[in-house]
Amino acid sequence: MSERKAVIKNADMSEEMQEDAIHIAAGAIDKHDLEKDIAANIKKDFDRKYHPTWHCIVGRHFGSYVTHETHNFIYFYLDDRAFLLFKSG
């Protein structure tokens, strides 16, 4: 896995979970070419580790307005992609 710089734009989760999100996202980028597959990888890992139901959006151009559970939200950039990861439901 190459060294990447993450820029966290907004987060409502523990430092440990934030680091985990970035680490999992970096691994998903290395494994997958399609953004939908990257998002699915991150979502499944977070469902497994932090219990369902997580939602993940990955892309270069999108807007969002979501409701999330307290302490279960992060929005960050890694490389040239934005990542929105949150738990709801």
Swiss-Prot record:
<keyword id="KW-0493">Microtubule</keyword>
<keyword id="KW-0206">Cytoskeleton</keyword>
<keyword id="KW-0505">Motor protein</keyword>
<dbReference type="GO" id="GO:0005868">
    <property type="term" value="C:cytoplasmic dynein complex"/>
</dbReference>
<keyword id="KW-0963">Cytoplasm</keyword>
<dbReference type="GO" id="GO:0045505">
    <property type="term" value="F:dynein intermediate chain binding"/>
</dbReference>
<dbReference type="InterPro" id="IPR001372">
    <property type="entry name" value="Dynein_light_chain_typ-1/2"/>
</dbReference>
<dbReference type="InterPro" id="IPR037177">
    <property type="entry name" value="DLC_sf"/>
</dbReference>
<dbReference type="GO" id="GO:0005737">
    <property type="term" value="C:cytoplasm"/>
</dbReference>
<comment type="similarity">
    <text>Belongs to the dynein light chain family.</text>
</comment>
<dbReference type="GO" id="GO:0007017">
    <property type="term" value="P:microtubule-based process"/>
</dbReference>
<protein>
    <recommendedName>
        <fullName>Dynein light chain</fullName>
    </recommendedName>
</protein>
<comment type="function">
    <text>Acts as a non-catalytic accessory component of a dynein complex.</text>
</comment>
<dbReference type="InterPro" id="IPR019763">
    <property type="entry name" value="Dynein_light_1/2_CS"/>
</dbReference>
<dbReference type="Pfam" id="PF01221">
    <property type="entry name" value="Dynein_light"/>
</dbReference>
<keyword id="KW-0243">Dynein</keyword>
<dbReference type="GO" id="GO:0005874">
    <property type="term" value="C:microtubule"/>
</dbReference>
